[in-house]
Amino acid sequence: MKRRILLVDDDVAVLLTLKAVLEMHDFDVHTATSVSDAKTKLDTGSYHMVITDMRMETETAGWQVVQAARAQKYRPATAILTAYPPPDSNWQDRGAQSLLVKPIGTRDLVRQIEALLVNHEDEKQSQSLDRSLQATRADFPEKNNRKVS
């Protein structure tokens, strides 16, 4: 199954180039050129990952895309793609799981995307197992309170 990526950038040349590169590496790539376009696609589709430029309509437009992605029930992996990395490391605190700095070579880009997708899926599975375990414990409260001698 191809992994679906939403790629968001207001520079159409960058968008089309990255789309072609990622499709050559067997990703199903959808594109958006603005925050509002990205939000619409996030609400109507389902993506494994969202990669967004940080600076589009505003200097913080990318963060709006990340927040919209993180609000989705399907919880896609999120990455900021920028030529202007933030001076501090608060990009993770703001919801992005990866920071991709332009220019970036094709090999490095694909490697970082693959690694992020693997880590993200592992985290989602771990969280799902934790929820299942908590639900099981809630179903059997008397066993949880038993003392072991």
Identify the role of each PLM range.
Residues 79-81:
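Hydrophobic/aromatic residues positioned on beta-strands within the core alpha/beta folds
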Residues 104-115, 121, 125:
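C-terminal output helix
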Residues 30-49, 57:
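Acidic, metal-coordinating helix/loop segments flanking the phosphotransfer/catalytic sites
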Residues 119-149:
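CheY-like receiver
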Residues 12-30:
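Two-component/phosphorelay signaling modules centered on CheY-like receiver
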Residues 40, 60-75:
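Short amphipathic alpha-helix used as the core "switch/output" element in two-component signaling
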Residues 64, 71, 83-101, 107, ...:
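Alpha4 helix (beta4-alpha4-beta5 surface) of REC/receiver domains from two-component response regulators
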Residues 11, 55-57:
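The short loop immediately C-terminal to the conserved phospho-acceptor aspartate in CheY-like receiver
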